[in-house]
């Protein structure tokens, strides 16, 4: 996920056009490379968030029906439609989540339905931040943030296992983390 000022290479376009544009700009096919998935904890997080997002309106309709404010059919209809939809969106979000280190670029993918790709030249990385929410800490996940010298821009690798995040940062910027890593 990008933060700070960002530049879009092309407006919404067919995948082939977007990939060809990226290959011309990057000078390689980094976006074509297979990405490393973020594991079962990230998958659980994506599925849980998808289902909980659709469970809230279903629960509200169930409560309204239980209090005789509404008939039962809206709650049942919402459950039949929204819960599988939330699950499908969670699966899609996990499928699109990944990262790779390819030919001097950190490549990250995230998003739902349309998905987003970003590639950052590793020579532009000046530092790393590991961020964790309370929920990520319990799942053993972190958000790895690559800080760049380009103003306030950064690139986030969402919900990656902590040990993978440290290894990725060390591989992307050899020597930068060495003083901070335990022998």
Where are these regions (language model features)?
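N-terminal basic, Ser/Thr-rich segments that initiate or prime the first beta/alpha elements at protein or domain
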Residues: 1-183
């Amino acid at each position: 996920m990008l933060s700070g000022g960002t530049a879009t290479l092309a407006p919404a376009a067919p995948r082939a056009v977007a990939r060809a544009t990226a290959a011309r700009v990057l000078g390689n096919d980094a976006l074509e490379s297979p990405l490393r998935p973020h594991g079962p904890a990230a998958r659980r997080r994506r599925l849980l968030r998808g289902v909980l997002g659709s469970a809230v309106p279903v629960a509200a309709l169930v409560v309204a029906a239980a209090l005789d404010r509404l008939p039962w059919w809206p709650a049942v209809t919402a459950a039949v439609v929204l819960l599988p939809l939330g699950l499908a969106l969670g699966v899609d979000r996990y499928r699109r989540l990944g990262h790779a280190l390819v030919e001097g670029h950190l490549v990250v993918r995230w998003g739902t339905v349309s998905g987003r790709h970003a590639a950052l030249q590793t020579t532009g990385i000046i530092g790393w931040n590991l961020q964790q929410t309370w929920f990520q800490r319990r799942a053993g996940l972190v958000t790895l943030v690559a800080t760049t010298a380009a103003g306030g821009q950064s690139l986030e690798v969402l919900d990656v296992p902590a040990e993978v995040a440290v290894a990725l940062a060390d591989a992307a910027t050899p020597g930068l983390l060495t003083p901070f890593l335990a022998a």
